[in-house]
């Protein structure tokens, strides 16, 4: 957070000294001195990030646009969700009429927020990009189908959604089925990979948690460990 605060401070200082600070493509927003709170500064930066960008020209340099997009994402975890979503909506609306640019942003968003190797994984933020991308109707049919599937999976797995019914096979070979039970306090469904250290550690943590064990014993919580 300290380094990001210094970045924001540096942008303001540079703006005062030189009149503007750029990222190689366009002028970055100049955060007013009157905004001193870190969260508020992040909000301003995210909300006004593309104000000086000519998005019809920015995509001519894909490398620079990639760097600009990464810088755009960098402060989002520290900004308010409503500010972030409004900024994404506005940005995507300005890009929406150019199919190749939409596909470029779609690939960037997936690699930055959703892929296994993503440095900043956020289903909610990626879903916001996806919803805007799908609205454009500018994708090829294979990509449209791909992103529609991702969108459906993410929407259905958000907090508060009800998991679908499914059948499974127990370790002893017997069959079982999961059906949503509204009388349960909670249901935990863990998708695990046998022999995977992260899966094993997650199960051990649950087993070792006293409060969880008591909730399971009382029947208020059910835990399913499923190996797809």
Go through the PLM ranges and name each one.
Residues 161-163, 183-184, 218:
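Extracytoplasmic
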Residues 176-207, 222-224:
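Short active-site neighborhood of thiol/selenol oxidoreductases, capturing the structured segment around
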Residues 16-174:
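Oxidative protein folding and maturation machinery
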Residues 217-228:
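Thiol-based oxidoreductase modules, predominantly thioredoxin-like and allied folds used
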Residues 155-158, 178-181, 215:
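Short boundary motifs at domain starts and secondary-structure transition points
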Residues 93, 204-211:
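Surface-exposed alpha-helical segments enriched in charged/polar residues
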Residues 210-218:
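Alpha-helix termini
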Residues 1-21:
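Bacterial Sec-dependent N-terminal signal peptides
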């Amino acid at each position: 957070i300290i380094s990001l605060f210094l970045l924001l401070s540096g942008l303001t200082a540079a703006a005062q000294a030189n009149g503007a600070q750029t990222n190689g493509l366009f002028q970055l927003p100049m955060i007013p001195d009157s905004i001193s709170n870190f969260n508020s500064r992040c909000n301003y930066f995210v909300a006004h990030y593309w104000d000086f960008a000519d998005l019809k020209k920015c995509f001519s340099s894909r490398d620079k646009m990639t760097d600009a997009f990464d810088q755009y994402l960098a402060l989002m975890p520290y900004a308010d969700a409503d500010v972030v979503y409004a900024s994404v909506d506005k940005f995507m609306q300005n890009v929406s009429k150019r199919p190749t640019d939409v596909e470029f942003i779609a690939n960037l968003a997936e690699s930055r927020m959703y892929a296994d190797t993503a440095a900043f994984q956020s289903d909610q933020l990626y879903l916001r990009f996806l919803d805007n991308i799908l609205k454009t109707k500018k994708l090829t049919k294979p990509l449209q189908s791909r992103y529609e599937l991702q969108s459906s999976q993410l929407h259905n797995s958000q907090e508060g959604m009800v998991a679908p019914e499914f059948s499974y096979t127990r370790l002893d070979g017997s069959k079982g089925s999961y059906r949503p039970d509204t009388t349960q306090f909670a249901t935990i469904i863990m998708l695990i990979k046998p022999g995977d250290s992260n899966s094993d550690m997650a199960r051990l943590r649950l087993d070792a948690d006293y409060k969880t064990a008591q909730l399971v014993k009382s029947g208020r919580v059910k835990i399913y460990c499923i190996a797809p």
